[in-house]
Amino acid sequence: MPTKPKAAKTPTKPATAKAGATLKSAARLPLARLPLEGLLVLDLTAHRAGPTAVRQLADWGADVIKIEQPGEEGHDATGSSRHGPDFQNLHRNKRSMTLNLKSPEGKAVFMALAAKADVVVENYRSDVKHRLGVDYDSVAKLN
């Protein structure tokens, strides 16, 4: 005669990570590190695809510096409001600075940052990146 399956037992006590653990002691535990924590990423991207890709790096813990062109105060390269939800979503977890890559001073600051960076992301047209001197070959010489 077949036996009837037994019902699973309900635990009588709630499970805890450690005996005697309290909310106060849990607050002292170190936070888990994010996978890209400690990486420096320079973000020269504009429009949708580039900022979305770099946002993922920032979400995973990379220190992302978004480099913006002068004259974009209040708006991004597409004309969207910097204070709107779309801009805020695309550029969350990023720091930002303004650099004029067409000026010798701005380019010098960028090159100093690029020498220390782990990653430089850009999505300029080929002629633009070469004219600005931020193409792969130019930046790779520094780092």
What are these regions (language model features)?
Residues 2-143:
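N-terminal helix-loop segment corresponding to the beta1-alpha1 unit
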